[in-house]
UniProtKB/Swiss-Prot annotation:
Biological process according to GO: lipoprotein biosynthetic process
Signal sequence segment: none
Enzymatic class: transferase
Cellular component GO terms held in the UniProt record: plasma membrane
Record's protein name: Phosphatidylglycerol--prolipoprotein diacylglyceryl transferase
Tree of life domain: Bacteria
This protein's UniProt keywords: Cell inner membrane, Cell membrane, Membrane, Transferase, Transmembrane, Transmembrane helix
Single GO MF descriptor: phosphatidylglycerol-prolipoprotein diacylglyceryl transferase activity
HAMAP family: Lgt (MF_01147)
Amino acid sequence: MTFPNINPIIFSVGPLAVSWYSLSYVVGILFGWFYASKIIEKFPTQITKKNLEEFVTYAIIGIIVGGRLGYILLYNPYKYFSNPIEILKTYEGGMSFHGGAIGVIIAAYIFCKRHKLNFLSLTDIIAPVVPIGLFFGRIANFINGELYGRVTNSSIGVIFPDSDLNLRHPSQLYEAFFEGLVLFCILAYAVFKRNTIKKQGLNSGLFLMFYSLFRIIIEIFREPDVQIGFIFDSLTMGQILSMPLLLLGIYLIIKTECRSITK
């Protein structure tokens, strides 16, 4: 299948341009905010709706600054340091999930310190929400024809306009499905059917573990960034960055369950 060359800019009014990438962030944040509010309503904790409203600004800054700096430092430092003006062109893409995650974690830590809130209580509310943003972000990647997969002979292969005209795995859609929809359903089941909110740290651990597993597996089908290629002959940067998160997720789950047993 040949992918249509879709303009990354949806529309523009004078100097203001609205891109698919920007829209995915806005929609993801709005839907995420709404969903987190519903979780707080059903499962009251130390975190209130007012806390959530105040944290949204922190989260946006963490996502944008962390995501952009993460991509620049981890994936393409030479390009941006040699032409710093490119750093500001976030509408063209170039955001790192791992960088954004670190940005939000730092933002959450600062917010909790200032408001005397428990850090894991907040991240347990955030964790079930993140797959919403991941879903819309990967759909935007697909529309932009970027971050595509490796060459394939499969019937589901797509010829992307900016690639080498070979059929390639639509790995953006794989990620949207597993890291977005499937992970959302797993965490929704955990929250609403298993009441995991009462086990501090469990939602955070489940998110980290399942996201990392899905990312490590899907990276097998995703084309490595051309400026980095493979690391240690077979691993991608995404896989390497996901491994510590996987271990942290498993640690949080075990710690939470052990704490529940001893109570």
